[in-house]
């Protein structure tokens, strides 16, 4: 393979999520609700060489542009990610993710006594910290395994 040869082919229309930390691509797919059963065309590169990250993952989703809510959640596990919107095989929009101040309804609180885990009509809300998130209701902080608490459908 030459330096100019693509490892994964270009997509005609959709979203490319680049500069994902190595090993996180499967979590990205889970966040997007992609499990291979719907027939979506997906290309995944894992642990490919990267000048910026050393090793990175990349996900290409044909025929789908991400919502801002999806991008906000992705930023929690892939803060260095770049989102590329592709149309007619050309990148028409490119931006780095930015972490929101809060996320609502996308994470589950691990505290069994939190009001969001009971049979109450309360969506979870977390404040985004430098190294994790804090439940706005009970104060529980999640620093590790954040992807395990994501509940986006």
From Swiss-Prot:
Gene Ontology terms describing biological process: 'de novo' pyrimidine nucleobase biosynthetic process; pyrimidine nucleotide biosynthetic process
Subunit field text: Contains catalytic and regulatory chains.
Note describing how the cofactor binds: Binds 1 zinc ion per subunit.
Protein name: Aspartate carbamoyltransferase regulatory chain
InterPro entries linked to this entry: Asp_carbamoyltransf_reg_N (IPR020545), Asp_carbamoylTrfase_reg (IPR002801), Asp_carbamoyltrfase_reg_C (IPR020542), Asp_carbatrfase_reg_C_sf (IPR036792), Asp_carbatrfase_reg_N_sf (IPR036793)
Any one Gene Ontology cellular component term annotated for this protein: aspartate carbamoyltransferase complex
Cofactor (UniProt): Zn(2+)
Pfam families in the cross-refs: PyrI, PyrI_C
Family named by the database record: Belongs to the PyrI family.
UniProt-annotated binding residues for Zn(2+): 109, 114, 135, 138
Gene expressing this chain: pyrI
Its biological purpose: Involved in allosteric regulation of aspartate carbamoyltransferase.
């Amino acid at each position: 393979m030459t330096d100019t040869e693509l490892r994964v082919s270009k997509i005609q229309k959709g979203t490319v999520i680049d500069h994902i930390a190595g090993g996180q691509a499967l979590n990205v797919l889970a966040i997007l609700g992609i499990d291979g059963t719907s027939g979506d065309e997906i290309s995944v590169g894992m642990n490919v060489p990267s000048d910026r990250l050393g090793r990175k993952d990349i996900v290409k989703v044909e025929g789908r542009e991400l919502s801002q809510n999806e991008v906000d959640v992705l930023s929690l596990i892939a803060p260095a990610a770049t989102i590329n919107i592709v149309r007619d095989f050309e990148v028409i929009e490119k931006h780095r993710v930015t972490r929101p101040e809060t996320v609502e309804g996308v994470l589950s609180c691990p505290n069994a006594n939190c009001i969001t885990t009971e049979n109450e009509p309360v969506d979870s809300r977390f404040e985004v910290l430098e190294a994790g998130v804090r439940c706005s209701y009970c104060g529980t902080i999640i620093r590790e395994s954040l992807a395990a608490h994501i509940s986006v459908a």
